[in-house]
Swiss-Prot record:
This is Phosphoribosylformylglycinamidine synthase subunit PurL. Gene3D superfamilies: PurM-like C-terminal domain, PurM-like, N-terminal domain. InterPro entries: PRibForGlyAmidine_synth_PurL (IPR010074), PurL_linker (IPR041609), PurM-like_C_dom (IPR010918), PurM-like_C_sf (IPR036676), PurM-like_N (IPR016188), PurM-like_N_sf (IPR036921). Pfam families: AIRS (PF00586), AIRS_C (PF02769), FGAR-AT_linker (PF18072).
Length: 720
């Protein structure tokens, strides 16, 4: 088959800039073959190389006594005691999910699950953070329904509980939705599997499903902006099969138990290319691949197609040669392909053979270690203008504006499509705050949350970055968990625009400050740039996934308020309305500065709540919508009315940070007040739970009416 001529148009279609192509010529001393061009394109794109973000990612705190393995592997590994580890990561599948919502979201779930089990962990929990355009945009309902069905279809069939996440709507996502998928798994701390190859002449083995043409060029597509050719990109979206993935999980865990594996890597972005290069690079070895041995489900596939296919449910392994028969038998038992497709070599070469031809012969290190790295120009986001006057609102009307918005309405329509109970270890299902999953066969549990407020990040990237981490810290604390570590999913627009790069830099600095102060190191993550359509970028959305530990379920704060319980706020209320949910939903204003985050207060208030958990019946962090929304959500979930005494829009709807709402039995309130005074922590009684009416500063409405609005608004907004 004749390969196309390498032209400037072909180079540009592969996402390579002229200076990058010039660098390729210098590295290999000749024009690349078509397959080599595809390999460089895949390895040097933003999605795989992090060429615009590497400089700043290196500044993040990534270590701590609890960290077994930080960024650089498939997922982060954190010690949870008793010889056990939690392995977790969050990753985006934004571009594919906009083009083909069901498969884009489904394969996002599949990919993140493989990142976890390729390290030897059995997945125990999933979350997803979703950002969509406004409900009345012509594409939004189709995308929402497809994405949610795709997540549910894959996760439910695979058999992992979805225990949390978030859903937001904003016009900035009209042309570019965000689908950030999180997975966590459990492994023995001394049985973690890594991706670095070792040993010369070791067999390189292909595992799992067959290779097709789906997803060819997917990684390159994920590093580009969208324009009016978007429909042409549909073939670059992968197709997933959760039942194959389930078999792959079981086969891999059985294989790992047989002591057959030297190293293993899932085939994700850029498929066979990226997995082989990463294994060789980390092990300082070359890799030779014979593509005739690759299991194929389509006829006449070219070397280019096989190297860049992103067909799902595939792994690459370096095998102990004496274990070939054992390993092959395991994969045959699970009805999965097992094929020796190459070997490790001592030279720094990535050698690709197909038929009797050499299709690629490249210096392997040049594909990863010497990939371009940019110090993009950036400008600091200017300080937000002071917030103008905000009219006083009827508190009930303000609450209705929030609970009637799909961003803050009850999300049962979403999570009822997800299985949150499979594996029978879910202690706290999606709904309010962090999800909690029991560590099977132990007294321990793990808590999971995902958080970011993009409006804050746009107004003030540094404070917005801090706030995403602080809110995750509070959500874990509010269920009684000690925060352990974080994963970041950095979703931004075009980094070649200095103002966008400035948002990224500011957010990284804020995240770094917060994870250091709160002892929640970043152990894994993902960067998704070029989230723009026709030059219009998304809101900067640095999603933080976080994991916390309960050493015993006795530490869990899982109750609901009861009739007559007091409502108290831990922390200081100053009434910050800048960039608040109320301002956006009721007045259509996104103005003012983001709320400042006092990290020392966050730590002190969180430690206070965990130390006094036995005195409270329920807890929630105060964030979007302030006291009024948090108190309503807590009361409504318990089927109770509510009376709040603070008056004024700012006191009820302000979004000051480092605050928690707690429900406390009246006979325990005095002890909690005494503990707060002793700890120097502000604690204010703000009302009472009970009855069948919601009363905010004297304005009232029946709980039943508000509950009906709250529980119907989401489905009505998207025509569900």
């Amino acid at each position: 088959m004749t390969e196309p001529e390498i032209t400037p148009e072909l180079i540009a279609a592969h996402g390579l800039k002229p200076d990058e192509y010039q660098r390729i010529l210098e590295i290999i001393g000749r024009a690349p073959t078509f397959t080599e061009l595809g390999i460089f394109s895949a390895m040097w794109n933003e999605h795989c190389s992090y060429k615009s973000s590497k400089k700043w990612l290196r500044t993040l705190p990534t270590t701590g006594p609890q960290v077994i393995c930080g960024p650089g592997e498939n997922a982060g590994v954190v010690d949870i005691g008793d010889g056990q580890a939690v392995i977790f990561k969050m990753e985006s599948h934004n571009h594919p999910s906009y083009i083909e919502p069901y498969q884009g979201a489904a394969t996002g779930v599949g990919g993140i699950l493989r990142d976890v089990f390729t390290m030897g962990a059995r997945p125990i929990a999933a979350m997803n953070a979703l950002s969509f355009g406004v409900p009345d945009h012509p594409k939004t309902a189709h995308i929402v329904k497809g994405v949610v069905e795709g997540i549910g279809g894959y996760g439910n069939a695979f058999g992992v509980p979805t225990v949390g996440g978030e859903v937001r709507f904003h016009r900035a996502y009209n042309g570019n939705c965000l689908v950030n998928a999180f997975a966590a798994g459990l492994a023995d701390a001394d049985r973690i599997f890594y991706s670095a190859a070792s040993g010369v002449g070791m067999p390189v083995v292909y595992l799992g499903a067959k290779t097709g043409r789906d997803g060819v060029g997917g990684a390159t597509m994920a590093s580009a902006e969208f324009d009016d050719t978007i429909e042409e990109k549909r073939p670059t979206v992968q197709v997933g099969d959760p039942f194959t993935e389930k078999r792959l999980l079981e086969a891999c865990l059985e294989l790992m138990a047989s002591d057959s594996v030297i190293s293993i890597q899932d085939m994700g972005a850029a498929g066979l290319t990226c997995s082989a290069v990463e294994m060789g690079d980390k092990g300082d070895l070359g890799i030779r691949l014979q593509l005739d041995a690759v299991p194929q489900r389509e006829a006449n596939m070219t070397a280019y197609e096989m190297m860049l296919s992103e067909s799902q449910e595939r792994m690459l392994m370096v095998l102990k040669p004496e274990k070939e028969a054992v390993a092959r038998a395991i994969f045959e038992k699970w009805d999965l392909d097992f094929a020796i497709v190459g070997e490790t070599i001592p030279e720094d070469r990535f050698l690709i053979l197909h038929g009797n031809e050499v299709k690629a012969d490249l210096p392997l290190k040049a594909l990863s270690g010497t990939a371009p790295e940019y110090d993009r120009p950036w400008i600091e986001t200017p300080a937000a203008a002071p917030l103008g006057a905000v009219p006083e609102v009827d508190p009930i009307e303000g609450l209705k504006a929030l609970i009637g918005s799909p961003s803050y309405a009850h999300k049962a329509w979403v999570w009822e499509q997800y299985d949150s109970q499979v594996m029978a270890d879910t202690v706290r299902a999606p709904g309010l705050g962090a999800g909690v999953v029991r560590v099977h066969g132990t007294p321990k549990a793990l808590a999971f949350t995902s958080d970011v407020t993009p409006r804050y990040v746009k107004a003030n990237p540094f404070e917005g970055g801090k706030q995403a981490v602080a809110e995750a810290y509070r959500n874990l604390t509010a269920v009684g968990a000690k925060p352990l570590a974080t994963t970041d999913n950095m979703n931004f627009g075009n980094p070649e625009k200095p103002e966008i790069m400035g948002q990224f830099v500011g957010a990284i600095k804020g995240i770094g400050a917060a994870v250091a102060a709160l002892d929640m190191p970043i152990v894994s993550g993902n960067v998704s740039l070029y989230n723009e359509t026709d030059g219009v970028g998304i809101l900067p959305t640095p999603t933080i996934g976080a994991v916390g530990l309960l050493t015993s379920l006795d530490e869990l704060i899982a109750g609901q308020p009861e009739e007559g319980d007091l409502a108290l706020v831990i922390g200081t209320t100053a009434g910050h309305l800048g960039q608040s949910a109320l301002l956006a939903e009721m007045f259509g204003r996104e103005e003012g500065d983001a709320p400042p985050v006092d990290l020392e207060a966050e730590k002190r208030h969180g430690e206070f709540l965990r130390a006094n958990r036995k005195l409270v019946r329920a807890a929630a962090d105060l964030s979007d919508g302030g006291l009024a929304l948090a108190a309503f959500e807590m009361a409504e979930a318990a089927g109770l009315g509510l009376t709040l005494t603070p008056s004024g829009t700012a006191a009820l709807f302000g979004e000051d940070q480092a605050r928690y709402l707690v429900a406390c039995a009246p006979d325990r309130a005095e002890a909690l007040q005494a503990a707060a005074e002793a700890a120097g922590v502000p604690l204010q009684e703000v009302g009472r739970f009970g009855g069948a009416t919601v009363t905010l500063a004297g304005a009232s409405a029946p709980l039943a009416d508000l509950s009906r609005l709250y529980r119907r608004a989401f489905a009505e907004a998207i025509g569900g």
